[in-house]
Amino acid sequence: MPKKKILMLVGDFVEDYEVMVPYQVLLVAGHEVHAACPGKRAGDKVATAIHDFEGEQTYSEKRGHNFQLNATFGELDETAYDALVIPGGRAPEYLRLNPRVLEVVQHFASSGKPIAAICHGPQVLAAAGVLQGKACSAYPAVGPEVTVCGGTFVPASSSFDNAHVDGNLVTAPAWPAHPAWMRAFLEVLGTRITT
């Protein structure tokens, strides 16, 4: 399996599990992962948020860990990467307002490179205009954005543990789907894990 170079777009209050788990899983699988945030440099940190499902009408939010960046967003050359990961949390709400972020996402989509997005991550895909004609899972509150931009929203299972693959696009509704989401993304990357 050839090692892939993967870009992870993050920002302050990215969901804690949704940044930490895929970052570590992809490293364990032998890939190189660069995490970058607009306005920050390699070595800087982003704050994370922990979202949980505790029985209320929506998720709860608590302060999470700090996550250290290992790439500088202002120096990115998206053509040097094989795949893209967009975690959820609060960060996609403002990342989607950055024209350079949208340009980076559009490069991956138009080049047919693998893209993985989870929870609120598809907000960035919707803003970049790359969901037209695609089926996509996301946190339920993001469903209307997927639909209004021409995508087909794939609802979460009752346990939020499903992932959906549409060509090079791998999406999931929230962190309970990490096993299915990462398994599907690794398959799209051509990574084989055997027991």
Pin down the residues of each PLM region.
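Extended, subdomain-level signal for the structured scaffold at the beginning of enzyme domains
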Residues: M1-S111, V124-A135, G143-T195
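Short, thiol/selenol-centered motifs that function as redox-active sites or metal-ligating centers
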Residues: I118-G121
